[in-house]
Amino acid sequence: MPATAGRVRMPANNRVHSSAALQTHGIWQSAIGYDPYAPTSKEEPKTTQQKTEDPENSYASFQGLLALARITGSNNDEARGSCKKCGRVGHLTFQCRNFLSTKEDKEKDPGAIEAAVLSGLEKIRRGVGKGEVEEVSSEEEEESESSDSDVDSEMERIIAERFGKKKGGSSVKKTSSVRKKKKRVSDESDSDSDSGDRKRRRRSMKKRSSHKRRSLSESEDEEEGRSKRRKERRGRKRDEDDSDESEDEDDRRVKRKSRKEKRRRRSRRNHSDDSDSESSEDDRRQKRRNKVAASSDSEANVSGDDVSRVGRGSSKRSEKKSRKRHHRKERE
């Protein structure tokens, strides 16, 4: 079983969808009133017509239809987006190289236009076996290699020649001379317009290049100025930072010196205080010792005098007192 079984359905009409742009039936019918899908009479055999027609003759009839459509024109005056010089679509106005325009065709006599239309229709209806149609087909094959504008001009010339043969060669000569004059004028105008356009383009290019150079030079100057300002700011910041660092180091050194001096002063004071306290203690000790010695001497003298009076008890007491005093001195 395929992977898409039961999901994809075939369309009812298995044909490629054609857009409305390809359906030109309405365009032909509104432009020249020609209906290619109109029903034909049952009396005329279709098979004989199809066998007699050749591809070259069908192409010639198609070109004739195009020429008729351009000569008669549609209800609208100008096609949408058409060239302003020649009135055709497919190029812009400054790109136009067509020597003939639809405006020139409108300036023709209405009788000549009607005669050209009738002759073209007769050529299409009569058939294909004539030599004139073969000449037209050969000329149109050569013209198919060139642009569409050349094809249109040649078809108009052929129609005008046929119409002129019927009514006279004077009208053909007049129309040909008028067309030549118009071609020359159009060529001169085209050359002038081309030269003017080229000069304008050169001027605009020069202006743009000069403007670009100026803008580039200005931008370079601005960048240089900005870089200089940045360098100056950086140098100032560095100088300020160096000065701040030097000031901080000086302050630190001063603080260190002051701390050292304070410590020295404190140590000196403590040393002096210690020495003073030690000397005072030594003096006190000496005074005590002197007092004790003096008291012991006085007691010894008193005890020697009173030996006779006092018995063994007094001597013992004096010994105890002397021992106590010695103990006190040793403790101190």
Curated annotation (Swiss-Prot):
UniProt keywords, alphabetically: Metal-binding, Nucleus, Zinc, Zinc-finger
UniProt cross-references to Pfam families, sorted A to Z: zf-CCHC_3
Main location class: nucleus
Basic and acidic residues bias (residue ranges): 41-54, 124-133, 154-163
Biased composition (Basic residues): 198-214, 227-236, 254-269, 314-332
GO cellular component: cytoplasm; nucleus
Subcellular localization: Nucleus
Protein name: CAX-interacting protein 4
Annotated source species: Arabidopsis thaliana (Mouse-ear cress)
